[in-house]
Regions:
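Alpha/beta-hydrolase fold catalytic core
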Residues: 1-40, 62-64, 101-102, 256, ...
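Conserved loop-alpha-helix segment in the C-terminal half of the alpha/beta-hydrolase fold
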Residues: 222-263
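Flexible "cap/lid" loop of the alpha/beta hydrolase fold
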Residues: 118-121, 128-161
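Conserved alpha/beta-hydrolase catalytic His-Asp/Glu region
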Residues: 159-214
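Active-site loop/oxyanion-hole signature of alpha/beta-hydrolase fold enzymes
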Residues: 23, 67-107, 277
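Post-His helix in hydrolase/transferase enzymes
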Residues: 269-281
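Conserved HGGG/HGGXW glycine-rich cap/lid loop of the alpha/beta-hydrolase fold
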Residues: 28-76
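Catalytic histidine-centered segment of alpha/beta-hydrolase-like enzymes
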Residues: 260-272
Length: 286
């Protein structure tokens, strides 16, 4: 079976769509599989959404009740006046409670990783494990001042005449090549909504100005659950220096680390099947 045929089969496994209210805003999430199975929660990165996982989640439905959240300001969730890691932690908890999930394995990409790690310190009982996908949760002290997270590259104020024009404009942030155009097209299809005057990104452009984060060094050092790391060996974000520092501070054993050859920051768009294999191995050992 070709990768495209695999993708076509995967997205035939359709999720159900749900909403839960958190701090007066409707938070959207998707669910695949039987709800009485152990929970597996996917958390997207900045300016992404739950449908990024449409072709990943079905691989786990035999063993898990799989959930993917749209954090506020993203996807089909409502926008807020301001954002913080604590607000997102409340949203994660609310989705777990709405699905009656007592303890979940969490898989989080990019900014979703720092959000999830912080949530482990607030609601430790909800986390069975946390797998970080090319996610910077702490920085070496000499890198903090000069670090750029690319949030300024998001232009949520652009208006397009139609969905096709909007989809053609879609780019991965941070920029990187990707040979799997059908995956990008699927993600782009779910990244825009029709508004006044045309089609716009679903992502809230003001998040970059209001999002509040914090240093997570102490949280990583005392994480209440196993931490796994899956990263792109060609990642332009998650460098070897950051990996080594994260392993040192978190005292994370080497057997919980998997690098995916030939992939960059958006590793599960570059090579989804290898990422699925890595995730199965790591969460299966928890």
């Amino acid at each position: 079976m070709s990768n495209f045929d695999w993708f076509e089969e995967s997205i035939k496994v359709l999720p159900t769509s749900h909403f839960v209210e958190v701090r007066d805003k409707k938070i959207h999430y998707l669910q695949w599989g039987e709800s009485n199975k152990p929970g597996l929660l996917f958390i997207h990165g900045y300016s992404a959404h739950a449908h990024w996982w449409d072709f990943i989640a079905p691989a786990f439905v035999e063993d898990y009740s799989v959930v993917a959240i749209d954090l506020s300001g993203a996807g089909d969730s409502e926008h807020r006046d301001d954002y913080s890691q604590e607000i997102f932690a409340d949203e994660i908890k609310a989705v777990c409670e709405d699905m009656c999930l007592d303890s979940v394995d969490v898989i989080a990409h990019s900014m979703g990783g720092s959000i999830s790690l912080n949530a482990t310190s607030i609601f430790p009982n909800f986390f069975k494990s946390l797998t970080l996908l090319d996610s910077i949760v702490i920085l070496p002290p000499d890198k903090v001042r000069g670090f750029s997270n690319n949030k300024s590259m998001i232009r949520a104020d652009f208006i397009y005449d139609d969905l096709e024009s909007a989809k053609e404009s879609f780019r991965l942030i941070p920029p990187q090549p990707c040979n799997n155009d059908y995956l990008l097209n699927h993600i782009a299809h779910h990244s825009f909504k029709e508004g006044k005057g045309g089609w716009v990104l679903k992502s809230d452009g003001k998040m970059k100005k209001t999002y509040k984060s914090k240093d997570l060094t102490d949280v990583l050092m005392s994480a209440p659950c196993p931490i796994n790391i899956v990263y792109g060996l060609m990642s332009q974000i998650f460098t070897k220096e950051i990996l080594d520092y994260t392993l040192y501070v978190g005292n994370i054993p080497e057997e919980r680390i998997i690098g995916i050859p030939g992939t960059m920051h958006h590793l599960f768009v570059d090579d989804p099947l290898s990422v699925i294999d890595a995730l199965r191995k790591l969460i299966g050992e928890n």
